[in-house]
Amino acid sequence: MTAALAAIGGKWKLIILYWLAESPKHFAALQRAMPGISQKVLTQQLRELMSDGIVNRDPKGVVPAPVVYSLSEYGRSVLPLVENVRLWGRTHLAVRADKDR
């Protein structure tokens, strides 16, 4: 459990994985998809995910060099967990809404 949380825990990593599961993305597209994340934090989170082999960084061979981030094959193995967390979150919101009524 500790190793899993170290690799994909925190406020932003699962959200990054969610958006990359949809399709590879440029840095700016990821940042737009996640209001509230700073450039510094997104950079740090992507570096950690790359270091763990979960995300690939693919610089294109033009100048200025646009970089595309994508899930690695290993990173795709996390997608069932990402989907389960997403579904649990929807259920949790519904339970809280019912409780507040």
Locations of regions flagged by a protein language model:
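Generic recognition of well-ordered alpha-helical segments
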Residues: 3, 32, 44, 80-83, ...
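Basic amphipathic alpha-helical segments that dock to polyanions
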Residues: 42, 46-49
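N-terminal helix-turn-helix DNA-binding core of bacterial DNA-binding proteins
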Residues: 1-41, 61-70, 99-101
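Short amphipathic alpha-helical/adjacent loop interface patches that line ligand
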Residues: 24, 34, 46, 75, ...
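Amphipathic alpha-helical dimerization/coiled-coil segments
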Residues: 18, 70-101
